[in-house]
């Protein structure tokens, strides 16, 4: 067992090194990729986080929260059209990712809310944070900061 464990740990370390390079993060059956946020005007009290989450396992898992250094609160939200009105609500306990499913957190859909900001994300300065899953646990991630109005990672062509 201990020999297997050390091989596993070595593999895990190698995978982690590769993942950091590719900006993919895994824990258990959960894979997180394309992690980003947008610049917000100075003085803004909220910012949003986006990412792609894949559940490679056989059971559902739930994105229940996380943290980012410059926000007092971190919530999982959903935006959707309801009778022609865009409504945003907090998901309790969180966002369920079904087995084999990939969920994209993006503007106008599911997203993370960073609330009560002490400082604003700045373009070109990646921000480290964590996301927490009910089963997979805590995953350390790094958010790439895109310009205001970006619709996706590396988009940067949003209209103002």
Task: Tell me the role of every PLM-derived stretch.
Residues 9-10, 20:
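Cleavable N-terminal signal peptides
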Residues 1-9:
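Bacterial N-terminal signal peptides that target proteins for export
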Residues 23-160:
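Compact, glycine-rich, soluble single-domain proteins
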């Amino acid at each position: 067992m201990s020999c297997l464990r050390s091989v596993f740990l070595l593999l895990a370390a190698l995978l982690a090194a590769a993942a950091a390079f590719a900006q993919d993060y895994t824990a258990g059956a959960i894979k997180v990729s394309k992690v980003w946020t947008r610049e917000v005007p100075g003085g803004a009290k909220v910012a949003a986080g986006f990412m792609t989450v894949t559940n490679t396992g056989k059971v559902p898992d739930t994105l229940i929260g996380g943290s980012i250094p410059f926000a007092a609160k971190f919530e999982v939200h959903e935006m959707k059209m309801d009778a022609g009105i865009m409504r945003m609500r907090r998901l309790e306990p969180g966002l369920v990712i079904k087995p084999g499913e990939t969920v994209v957190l993006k503007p106008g859909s599911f997203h993370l809310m960073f609330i009560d900001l002490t400082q604003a994300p700045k373009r070109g300065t990646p921000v480290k944070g964590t996301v927490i899953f009910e089963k997979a646990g805590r995953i350390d991630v790094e958010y790439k900061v895109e310009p205001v109005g970006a619709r996706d990672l590396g988009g940067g062509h949003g209209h103002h």
